Swiss-Prot record:
This is Uroporphyrinogen decarboxylase. Substrate binds at residues 21-25, 71, 146, 201, 316. Catalyzes the decarboxylation of four acetate groups of uroporphyrinogen-III to yield coproporphyrinogen-III. One of its GO terms (cellular component) is cytosol. PROSITE patterns: UROD_1, UROD_2. Belongs to the uroporphyrinogen decarboxylase family. PANTHER family: METHYLTETRAHYDROFOLATE:HOMOCYSTEINE METHYLTRANSFERASE RELATED (PTHR21091), UROPORPHYRINOGEN DECARBOXYLASE (PTHR21091:SF169). It comes from Rickettsia akari (strain Hartford).
Length: 338
């Protein structure tokens, strides 16, 4: 049985495992391939290289799912938006400010997303039937906030000020991104993705009213649109940092799998697993420590979630300085509990 695609697993003894950023800079084999292409987005669009790095952690660790190597910002980039990735800085974007910018976004599509779908097809052909392939996109609020801020890590003052002061334009931009995100996910499913995930990295910065408008409502629209075409495809949502609003999210969004960050108590995860499959939530920093700590923290999660609808993952992505042998040890710990 494909453990991630069928996470309500008929085999309750097997805990599905995969990790966010499982293909990445902590792997020497990844760095070797990455060094061959200077521009990060060019690397994301290179069919052979992106396929190779997607498969690397599967070959090394035997995870239950591969997640396609791509980036959440390929979507605005596919509509002509200026994006550059600076070494040790992150993405730098043209800042979205006006109705003129919205008109530009609507009139400058390109065919770059076709490369993503080619990569999915190529990866799918190389995976066994027991390994799921996860396609993904950034959730509308997170993609929108990158465009409004013009950069990555930030304090979100610019984004929030914009949505408060420009309600109509903010809604137009949100709706545009929502529609295109749904289309992007549908095309990934058509190309062979078994599971789809929405990453909302910055959802936790919004107050409740804005969380409803910019996180819950667009996520719900995307899921419903995808399910019209692929009613049985499992969909994962990750409203990172949602805190107390996770429960509102579960109640209002028809998601199959809820990914949670490391700040969510295990008691909450157990409770929620009666309504939705829960994915998470080991602190990625634990993988920077030693085997004793890794084993202790992993076993605690496994014991608490035993018999529940649960997928083992981290609370966020694998950190670049993570020793690969620690990832292997964690995987062995989880497998030993089956």
């Amino acid at each position: 049985m494909n453990q991630i695609s069928n996470p309500l697993k008929g085999n309750n003894n097997k805990i599905p495992i995969w990790f966010m950023r499982q293909a990445g800079r902590y792997l020497s084999e990844y760095k070797k391939v990455r060094e061959t292409t200077k521009n990060f987005l060019d690397f994301c669009y290179d069919v052979n290289k992106a396929t190779e790095v997607t498969l690397q952690p599967i070959k090394r660790y035997g995870f239950d799912a591969a997640i396609i190597f791509s980036d959440i910002l390929v979507l605005p980039h596919a509509f002509g938006w200026e994006i550059d990735f600076k070494e040790n800085i992150g993405p730098i974007l043209k800042q979205f400010k006006s109705q003129e910018d919205f008109k530009y976004l609507q009139s400058n599509p390109n065919n770059k997303l076709g490369k993503v779908y080619e990569i999915i097809k190529k990866v799918k052909a190389d995976l066994t039937s027991t390994t799921s392939l996860i396609g993904f996109a950034g959730s509308p609020w997170t993609v929108m906030s990158y465009m409004l801020e013009g950069k990555g890590k930030h304090d979100f003052k610019t984004s929030k000020k914009f949505i408060y002061e420009n309600k109509i334009l903010a809604k137009e931009l949100l709706n545009f991104i929502t529609e295109k995100t749904a289309d992007h996910l549908i095309n990934q499913a058509k190309s062979g993705a078994d599971v789809l995930k929405l990453f909302d990295s910055w959802s936790g910065v919004l107050p409740e009213d804005e969380f409803t408008k910019f996180v819950i409502e667009p996520t719900k629209k995307i899921i419903l649109k995808v399910k019209e075409v692929f009613p049985k495809i499992p969909m994962i949502a990750f409203p990172k940092g949602a805190g107390l609003l996770y429960e509102k999210f579960i109640k209002e969004v028809p998601v199959d799998i809820l990914a949670v960050d490391q700040m969510v108590p295990l008691e909450k995860m157990k409770k929620w697993s009666d309504k939705v499959i829960v994915q998470g939530n080991l602190d990625p920093v634990v993988l920077l420590t030693n085997k004793e700590i890794i084993k202790e923290k992993a076993y605690k999660i496994i014991q608490e979630m035993k018999g529940k609808n649960f997928i083992f993952n981290l609370g966020h992505g694998i950190l670049p300085k993570t020793p690969p042998e620690n990832v292997e040890f964690l995987t062995e710990c989880i497998r030993s509990c089956e």
